[in-house]
Regions:
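Conserved GTPase G-domain signal focused on the G5
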Residues: 50-51, 217-246
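Flexible beta-alpha connector loops of hexameric P-loop NTPases
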Residues: 92-101, 182-187
Length: 246
């Protein structure tokens, strides 16, 4: 049942999108490809950006344990599977030089792995940024110094950047909690952040990314659950980037 909820969200978003029929058909073929072959996606970012919450939202169930408070939950790369969709949840960077060095080596090792056919194991890397943070230096270093140099051929088409916690981008201000969406001031702020991230990544790597923003939703320390926002857009973003062949 959970598999259907993911695919239905993707298909509904494609069918309702204001895109040409040719492009719509291409996206539908990508969904079929996702169903037919195993797709490995690495999810990475700085500590506290919401990687585990994003995985839980995508799977529509609590498969990844979310850290509460100051301690990050993910300390090693963890694998989560839902049929042909395989997500690799990496430890967050930014918790100290020694830990970062260890995590970086593990990320590089995973990026270097190949499948039984000799192709790169990791098909896509999704870098998640914390929309509520002004300091994104750790994430930019991760992209420019770890992922780009170690991701092999076609990397310019296989790196996705998504800004999580859109609801907290202005410290919770200008978010309509009843309708679970940003008002126009926050939309403008988020759009400016998208352009800023795009510029920073291009300056550092020469690669053009097209960031999106969303909110995975999360459970706080008291078990209160907030609703996801723009999750279907995140799924659509991933489907759009699926390689045409392994």
């Amino acid at each position: 049942m959970r598999k259907e909820s993911i695919y239905e969200a993707i298909l509904n978003d494609i069918m309702n999108a204001s895109i040409s029929e040719n492009y719509k058909n291409k996206m539908l073929k990508n969904v079929m490809r996702l169903k037919a072959q195993k797709m490995n996606i690495m999810i990475t970012g700085a500590t506290g950006c919401g990687k585990s919450s994003t995985i839980n939202a995508m799977f529509n169930t609590e498969v990844a344990k979310v850290g509460v408070g100051v301690d990050p939950e993910t300390m090693e790369i963890r694998k989560y599977e839902l049929d042909n969709l395989v997500l690799w949840d990496t430890p967050g960077l930014g918790d100290g030089k020694e830990a970062d060095n260890r995590h970086t080596k593990n990320i590089i090792k995973k990026l270097s792995e190949v499948d039984k056919n000799g192709n790169a194991l990791i098909d896509l890397v999704l870098v998640i940024l914390d929309g509520g943070s002004r300091d994104l230096g750790t994430a930019y270093e991760l992209i420019s110094k770890v992922i780009i140099p170690n991701f092999g051929e076609g990397k310019e088409n296989r790196i996705l950047v998504a800004i999580n916690q859109a609801d907290m981008a202005m410290k919770g201000h200008n978010w309509n909690y009843d309708r679970n969406k940003p008002n126009w001031k926050l939309v403008n702020f988020l759009e400016e952040k998208v352009w800023s991230v795009q510029d920073r990544v291009y300056e550092a790597t020469g690669i053009i990314v097209e960031p999106i923003y969303y909110s995975a939703g999360y459970k706080d320390g008291w078990g209160e659950q907030s609703r996801p926002y723009n999750l279907s857009k995140l799924l659509y973003y991933i489907v759009k980037a699926i390689p045409s062949e392994k």
